[in-house]
């Protein structure tokens, strides 16, 4: 199989998710950075590959895959060991719901392009945007804590990482990067984070381990 190519941005939560999934599956891949600070995702060259102009995009098996959850689902089907979803239909639905609560409920409201729009187009102050971010983070993580607590072990579902953890870890990273909100009210999430970050598959995907991760965004 030709080496897959991940069109990536070191600090993107969605890209971070896919890096984790690729590492968990043991897939060797090439990372090509698309610098969001320079609007490279809007270039004609990149939009010819991905009309949405988002990262990540994964070129694999002759396909160009977009949207992080779709990519992760493809990887789980293409490389079934280790599985990122349980076998039981009900348990599978629960894990998918937890993953979606992060990727579809929290992340879109606190995405960088939304925060910049609030500031530049809506005229909101830095303080107001910070309040917006903290509000949706706290509300979303509170819900996820309640969803995860009944089935959690070392991770959000049992004692092995699933797609829910793949989505959680980047969101907690961004929460710490962009707000001073205490996360102590989420012990289940923090336990999963500690166990995940002890695994090389998660640690190697961390933004600071990427080539461009040494340049800190101001």
Report residues per predicted region.
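Short, solvent-exposed turn/loop segments enriched in Gly/Ser/Thr/Pro and often Arg
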Residues: 35, 163, 209
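A local structural micro-motif
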Residues: 30, 107, 184, 204-205
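Non-catalytic alpha-helical scaffold/packing segments enriched in small hydrophobic residues
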Residues: 70, 74, 94-97, 101, ...
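GST-like fold's C-terminal all-alpha helical module
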Residues: 104-198
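Long hydrophobic alpha-helical segments typical of transmembrane helices together
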Residues: 185-218
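GST-like domain detector, emphasizing the conserved glutathione-binding G-site
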Residues: 1-128
């Amino acid at each position: 199989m030709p080496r897959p190519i991940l069109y990536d941005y070191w600090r993107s939560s969605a890209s971070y998710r896919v890096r984790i999934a690729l590492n968990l599956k043991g897939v060797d891949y090439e990372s090509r950075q698309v610098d969001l600070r320079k609007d490279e995702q809007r270039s004609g060259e990149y939009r010819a590959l991905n009309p949405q102009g988002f990262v990540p995009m994964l070129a694999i098996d002759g396909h160009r895959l977009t949207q992080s959850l779709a990519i992760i689902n493809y990887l789980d089907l293409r490389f079934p060991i280790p599985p990122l979803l349980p076998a039981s239909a009900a348990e599978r639905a629960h894990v998918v719901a937890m993953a979606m609560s992060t990727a579809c409920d929290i992340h879109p409201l606190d995405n960088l392009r939304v925060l910049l729009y609030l500031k530049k187009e809506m005229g909101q102050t830095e303080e107001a945007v910070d309040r917006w971010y903290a509000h949706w983070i706290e509300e979303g993580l509170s819900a996820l804590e309640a969803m995860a607590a009944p089935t959690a072990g070392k991770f959000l579902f049992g004692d092995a990482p699933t797609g829910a953890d793949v989505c959680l870890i980047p969101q907690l990273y961004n929460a710490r990067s962009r707000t001073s909100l205490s996360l102590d009210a989420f012990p289940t999430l923090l336990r999963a984070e500690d166990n995940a970050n002890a695994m090389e598959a998660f640690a190697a995907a961390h933004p600071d381990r990427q080539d461009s991760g040494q340049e800190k965004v101001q």
